Amino acid sequence: IDLNVYNEALSLSHSIGSDLSVLQQVKMRGRNKTHERGITFDGNRLILSQMGVRDVFRAQSESKNRGHVGLVLVRDISASMANDERYIHAIKSDLALSMAAESLSKMHVSNIVFPFKESEFEIIKTFDQSVEESLSKFTLGCKGYYTPTGSALMAAVDLLLDSQFDRKIIFLITDGYPNKSEFTIVEVMEKAKCNGIEIVGVGIKTDEIIGFETDTFVTVDDTSLLSIEVSKLVHQILS
């Protein structure tokens, strides 16, 4: 990989790490008070039962604790990414996000690119591999003339379904225009939602990602703006 690209991505990773760390905040059942475990009556709700309130049980307490997060970065390397050097901004974003996540003790990152040679996608880094040992697979090349976004996203969903993380998130890095694919974006979104998996987009030099609502992605016109857009992703979309 180009040394300048790597160094810029490494520098960017330092500026986005603190924002990504917020994603480790996971809603978990509180375990502080023994008497709150299981089903118990709520005194305040019991009083209201005379007025017709039927739910008189105490809700399980919830708190935000640091949990293990599985993050899959799915990057578009189709031919259209060569326009306006989008692929360079995409790989810098991919690497920066990967290295930032890797620096956090409870975040685990895997990377997928699509399309890849004769396949619709390729897993270039698994959760148990480091960025450094997978670096040779982070290619700048544009590998295909079609964009099987749905299939690549479904692979990411399946990867997370096979994991035991407390929170599961997918970042799609793309110029936003899927085509030939076994699965539609809608099908993937529905499966992800049913299984508690969050999917957000990082649009590279585009104000539209087909299949994504406007409040589920950010636009990166230049990687110098990546830290600003990651902050939006974390605090406005994934909060």
Model-flagged regions — what are they?
Residues 81, 179-180:
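Short, solvent-exposed loop/turn segments at secondary-structure junctions
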Residues 86-90, 144-153, 226-230:
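Phosphate/oxyanion-binding active-site loops and adjacent basic polyanion-contact surfaces
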Residues 1-71:
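Acidic/polar low-complexity segments with low predicted structural confidence
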